[in-house]
């Protein structure tokens, strides 16, 4: 699996993830890019789960963003509907964490589109560790969203055997 963490704080949203890909008990790649920008750099997305499945979902999600002119929530709901009802898509095993300047969502293969509490999203095998670390930093420091994501992922990589310390981190800043 992996760790994907998103923090929304002070007009900034950040999604970061590690780069480890495993096959059974073996690390097969250490620098997979599990976080990407989509829709002309207006949306960021990260995935946890099967790499091939996730890349398929990234492509489908970007098509939905184009179809619905970048409306994040509508695009996520339409992707979740297709994911849940299509015979082939239903077999894809991955989770997506997506965000634009205003909204953050988790999209699952069960058709769930979840808006997270506390402006935090954490998915994957190390998600709970990263979430706990991020909450502690939000409540007890004045770090930026990007600094929190970096430090929480670093902490997680020292605990979760399916998370490494090669990170991809993307951010969006809102003027509002």
Swiss-Prot record:
PROSITE patterns: PROTEASOME_BETA_2
Main localisation: cytoplasm
Catalysis performed (reactions): ATP-dependent cleavage of peptide bonds with broad specificity
GO biological process assignments: proteolysis involved in protein catabolic process
Binding positions (Na(+)): 157, 160, 163
GO MF, one example: threonine-type endopeptidase activity
EC supergroup of this enzyme: hydrolase
Keywords carried by this UniProt record: Allosteric enzyme, Cytoplasm, Hydrolase, Metal-binding, Protease, Sodium, Threonine protease
Pfam families the record matches: Proteasome
GO cellular component terms given for this protein: HslUV protease complex; proteasome core complex
Keyword Hydrolase: yes
EC number, as in UniProt: 3.4.25.2
Cited function: Protease subunit of a proteasome-like degradation complex believed to be a general protein degrading machinery.
Similarity comment: Belongs to the peptidase T1B family. HslV subfamily.
Name assigned to this protein: ATP-dependent protease subunit HslV
Native source species: Buchnera aphidicola subsp. Baizongia pistaciae (strain Bp)
């Amino acid at each position: 699996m992996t760790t994907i963490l998103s923090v929304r704080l002070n007009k900034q949203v950040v999604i970061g993830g590690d780069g480890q890909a495993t096959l059974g008990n073996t690390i097969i790649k250490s620098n997979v890019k599990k976080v990407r920008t989509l829709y002309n750099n207006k949306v960021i997305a990260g995935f946890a789960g099967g790499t091939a499945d996730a890349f398929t979902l990234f492509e489908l999600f970007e098509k939905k963003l184009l179809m619905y002119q970048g409306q994040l929530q509508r695009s996520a709901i339409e992707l979740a509907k297709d994911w849940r009802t299509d015979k082939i898509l239903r077999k894809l095993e991955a989770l997506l964490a997506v965000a634009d300047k205003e909204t953050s969502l988790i999209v699952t293969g069960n058709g769930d589109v979840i808006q997270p509490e506390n402006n935090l999203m954490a998915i994957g095998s190390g998600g709970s560790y990263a979430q706990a670390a991020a909450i502690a930093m939000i409540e007890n420091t004045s770090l930026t969203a990007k600094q929190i994501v970096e430090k929480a992922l670093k902490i997680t990589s020292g605990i979760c055997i399916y998370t490494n310390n090669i990170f991809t981190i993307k951010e969006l800043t809102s003027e509002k």
